[in-house]
Amino acid sequence: MSDRLSQLQEAVDQLMEQFIATYFYIDRHHDLKTFSPKDTIAPSKADQPPEVDTLPPDVFQAGQLELARDLITREQQIEYLISSLPGLDNSEQDQLQSIKELEEELNVAEKQRQEAVKEKDEVLVKLDQTLRSIRRY
């Protein structure tokens, strides 16, 4: 699993993609209306696909509602990721203390690793001695 900052960046990228998809949906499927009696709606050319594919009002509104809910859900996920970032509720001293504790844990783990490597080397020496004694017979 990726770290929180990467998750946050991915969530923001996905939110931007959702904004673009929402804009495209509204731009593509809105109802054509005039602002004044003098306005006219230009007919689309026969050899070109229509620029607007008007949907029935109830279908269009349902689509808008679903897209709005998706945007809200994604925004809430971003808020959660932001709130879970370290350091927002911790002072600098708390963060330094946490780093010191992590360094101590790392030192303990490194000592364990070194002991395991030493034990492995000892076992290899014993195995080598055993194999050499078997060859002599």
From Swiss-Prot:
Its main location: nucleus. It is found in: Nucleus. It comes from the Eukaryota. Residues 87-130 form a coiled coil. Keywords: Activator, Coiled coil, Nucleus, Transcription, Transcription regulation. It holds the Pfam family Med21. Residues 37-56 are annotated as: Disordered. One of its GO terms (biological process) is regulation of transcription by RNA polymerase II. One of its GO terms (molecular function) is transcription coregulator activity. One of its GO terms (cellular component) is mediator complex. SUPFAM superfamilies: Mediator hinge subcomplex-like (SSF140718). Belongs to the Mediator complex subunit 21 family. Component of the Mediator complex. Component of the Mediator complex, a coactivator involved in the regulated transcription of nearly all RNA polymerase II-dependent genes. Mediator functions as a bridge to convey information from gene-specific regulatory proteins to the basal RNA polymerase II transcription machinery. Mediator is recruited to promoters by direct interactions with regulatory proteins and serves as a scaffold for the assembly of a functional preinitiation complex with RNA polymerase II and the general transcription factors. This is Mediator of RNA polymerase II transcription subunit 21.
